[in-house]
């Protein structure tokens, strides 16, 4: 187990950070074609792990499958994301989640992830590198459009993901923010 932990980047992240530093750290990017994404990233020259097949059983005994790989390294101290592909297409997955009542409406109303905010020393340089590496269209000078959500790069010393911003329908939640460890969750 120790050897496997040493080899897998996400396990190394957890071993290095936890339990002292609960933080938003490395984002996941979902792919519908992980093999093509893997090949494209390898061609850019970054170090990628092998693609690993994973699975677990949900509480009802159904097998949930996925494929995953990590991108080693960073841009000016900001670690790269990891890439994940679920073992079923979105429509099938959503149908299964609804049948299991896991895709039920949230009791507080509609909540949608809108932004992942990264605090970095040089926002434009990091944005430009991630745009070149990941292919997302630019959003202003310091952001990327990530399929309807946004990566926002703000100037600061943390060099990590620091905040998740959610759009909410419930007026009582608007303007609220809370912290879990070193991560901020904000509702707009």
Regions found by a protein language model. Name each.
Residues 2-108, 112-122, 139, 143-188:
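Vicinal oxygen chelate
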Residues 37-44, 122-137:
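Amphipathic alpha-helical segments
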């Amino acid at each position: 187990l120790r050897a496997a932990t040493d080899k897998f980047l996400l396990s190394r992240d957890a071993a290095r950070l936890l339990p002292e530093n609960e933080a938003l750290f490395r984002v996941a990017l979902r792919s519908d074609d992980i093999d093509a994404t893997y090949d494209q990233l390898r061609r850019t020259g970054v170090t990628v792990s092998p693609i690993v097949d994973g699975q677990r059983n949900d509480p009802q005994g159904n097998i949930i499958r996925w494929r995953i790989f990590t991108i080693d390294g960073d841009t000016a101290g900001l670690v790269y994301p990891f890439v994940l592909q679920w073992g079923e297409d979105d429509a099938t997955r959503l149908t299964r989640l609804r049948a299991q009542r896991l895709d039920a409406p949230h009791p507080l109303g509609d909540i949608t992830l809108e932004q992942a905010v990264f605090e970095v020393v040089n926002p434009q340089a990091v944005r430009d590198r991630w745009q070149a590496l990941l292919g997302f269209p630019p959003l202003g000078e310091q952001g990327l459009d990530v399929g309807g959500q946004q990566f926002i790069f703000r100037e600061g010393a943390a060099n990590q993901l620091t905040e998740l911003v959610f759009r909410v329908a419930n007026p009582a939640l608007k303007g609220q923010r809370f912290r879990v460890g070193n991560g901020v969750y904000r509702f707009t």
